[in-house]
Every structure is written in C-alpha cells, then in structure tokens.
From Swiss-Prot:
This is UPF0200 protein TSIB_0920. It comes from the Archaea. One of its GO terms (molecular function) is ATP binding. The keyword Nucleotide-binding applies. InterPro entries: NTP_hydrolase-rel (IPR022970), P-loop_NTPase (IPR027417). Gene3D superfamilies: P-loop containing nucleotide triphosphate hydrolases. The keyword Transmembrane does not apply. ATP binds at residues 7-14. Keywords: ATP-binding, Nucleotide-binding. Belongs to the UPF0200 family.
Length: 190
C-alpha cells in the first residue's frame, strides 16, 4: 500500500508521518527530495530557491519529476514493508506516476486541512530555512503550491483530516484512520 499524504504547508502532514512511523511504516518526503536536489545544485534552501528547483525539475523531467525521483526509494522500502507513506505529493501527475510504477499496490490519498492562520502560526514556529518569514511570503507560497496542482490532489483525496484542534485530538483522528486502513500498531507509544 502506498499512502500519499497531501496538504498545504504547515497543515500537519509531518504528524501523520510520525504517527504512522510508530506503526512501523516508513516514509519518503517529496520536500526532502527537492531539498536534496537544491543542495546538489548549490541552490540555497530559501522559499525562492526551493520553488526554483521544483520548477527546474519539472521542466527537465516533466510534471511528475519529484515522483520519478522518489520511486526508487519507495520501491526499495516496499521490499521490506507492507506500506510506505509519501509525504508532500503536489499534483495528480505525481499520483499517477506512483500508480503506474506500482500497479500492484493500492494508492491512497490522505489530505490534511488547516486554516491559513493556523498554518502560518505553525510555520512561524517550525523555523526551517525554506519556511516563509512573513504573511506575504506565506500567501505567495500557497499560490505557488496551488499552481503545481496541490488543490486538485486534495479535492480527490480518499480521506480528509481537519487539523484545527489540539494535538491530542489530531493524533486520535490519525490513529482512527490508521485502524480504518487496517494498519496494525507496532511501536505505538507517546
């Protein structure tokens, strides 16, 4: 099973990855792939740099470029795991790339939604170098994400989790979804 976790920046995708990791499910981060590629190309990890690398990759390899780079990692993990989480898919082209590469696997999309204000607060605290430093940078990043097609993936998600509440409540929602997906608890402790 391939579980694609999608959502706008700061929506809470990473928390799903952490909780499913406690169930023994590994993950591949699409954002990490772009950051690694930026490092390889000598591009700074700023919002502008990350956007530039994302666009360059798509120009060079097609709209599913980041998925193409992720597929070997996913393939390797599926050799030893029943499921893999892919965090940060941005387009239906990327979803289709995973379906084409792994026709024997069920591909599930989980979308996470949080209000812009909540997401901005989270990103302001996160402190990653490519996080927006102002509300205008935040809005610009949202528009760039939507131009990649992220809204279409969210709209066609199999499951939607709203993350506006306390972390404990959000974790419970994630746990219930894992149970619905038939994922067995392995290392589940907090």
């Amino acid at each position: 099973m391939i579980i694609c976790v999608v959502g706008m920046p700061g929506s809470g995708k990473g928390q799903i990855v952490r909780i499913f990791g406690k169930y023994g499910i590994p993950h591949v981060s699409m954002g990490d792939i772009v950051r690694e590629e930026a490092d390889r190309r000598g591009v700074p990890r700023t919002p502008e740099g990350m956007n530039s690398v994302s666009i360059q990759l798509r120009q060079e390899l097609g709209d599913n470029a980041v998925a193409k780079l992720a597929i070997p990692k996913v393939r390797e993990l599926l050799k030893t795991h029943e499921a893999v989480i892919i965090e940060g898919v941005r387009s239906l082209d990327e979803i289709q790339a995973f379906k084409d590469a792994f026709p024997e696997e069920k591909v599930i999309i989980i979308a996470v939604h949080s209000s812009p204000q909540k997401r901005f607060e989270r990103l302001s605290k996160r402190g990653r170098s490519d996080d927006p430093k102002s509300w205008s940078e935040f809005e610009a990043r949202d528009w760039k994400e939507l131009k990649f097609g992220l809204g279409n993936v969210i709209a066609l998600a199999d499951y939607l989790i709203v993350n506006e509440s306390h972390l404990t409540q959000y974790r419970r929602k994630i746990e219930r979804l894992a149970e619905r997906l038939g994922i067995k608890k392995k290392y589940f402790t907090f």
